[in-house]
Each structure stands twice: as C-alpha cells, then as structure tokens.
C-alpha cells in the first residue's frame, strides 16, 4: 500500500508540474521554453499511470484523492497559501476515499 501511495504522489506531482509550467508561461509571461519540460512531465505522468496495478478506472478514481492532497501541498509550498480547516478536512476525506478504493483492489 505504501508503494502504491508513493507512486500516486509521484504521478500527481508530474501532472501538477506539467500543468503549472504552461500556466507560468500564459499567466506570468514566463519563457515559452517551459512548455518543453511541461510536455516531458505530462508524458512521465501518463507513463506512471500505467505502472499502477489495477483497472484504469479504479486507478483514476483512487488517484483523485492523492491528487487533491498533492495539490494542497503545492498550494502551501509553492503558492505560499496557508491551508484552512476546510482544506485539511477535504484532503482527509479524499485520502480516505483513495485508501478504501485501493484496499478493495483484488478483492472482487
């Protein structure tokens, strides 16, 4: 379960970076060259999704919970926004949903 969770976090980080770099280019007038590492990051994101040991629909559903938590960590660390009780509560609920889905893999 720990390996799967870490793989989910790595997958989410690649997706967030792959989307953040074009955002910097479009919203903050950053270099267009950021699109190159963004494309690489998104390709890595897709490849990482293929490493998960379950049906794709289950992967995407469980991944959503980890993505929420990773995005909130990004909000805190990169954007410098203090997380609220609502952020923490939502992340906990999303992560619980992910854990329930992952725990059910192979049991059906």
Swiss-Prot record:
Ranges per topology, Periplasmic: 1-5, 52-60, 106-108
Name of the protein in its database record: UPF0060 membrane protein YnfA
Ranges per topology, Cytoplasmic: 27-30, 82-84
Membrane topology: Multi-pass membrane protein
GO cellular component: plasma membrane
Chain's gene name: ynfA
Location in or out of the cell: Cell inner membrane
Annotated family: Belongs to the UPF0060 family.
The organism's place on the tree of life at top rank: Bacteria
The organism of origin for this protein: Shigella dysenteriae serotype 1 (strain Sd197)
Keyword terms of this UniProt record: Cell inner membrane, Cell membrane, Membrane, Transmembrane, Transmembrane helix
Transmembrane portions of the chain: 6-26, 31-51, 61-81, 85-105
């Amino acid at each position: 379960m720990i390996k799967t969770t870490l793989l989910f976090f790595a997958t989410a980080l690649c997706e967030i970076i792959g989307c953040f770099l074009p955002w910097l280019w479009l919203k903050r007038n950053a270099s267009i060259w950021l699109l190159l590492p963004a494309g690489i990051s998104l390709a890595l994101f897709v490849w990482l999704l293929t490493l998960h040991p379950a049906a794709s629909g289950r992967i995407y559903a469980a991944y959503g919970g980890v993505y929420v938590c990773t995005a909130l960590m990004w909000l805190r660390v990169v954007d410098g926004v203090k997380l609220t009780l609502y952020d923490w509560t939502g992340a906990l609920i999303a992560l619980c949903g992910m854990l329930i889905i992952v725990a059910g893999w192979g049991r059906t």
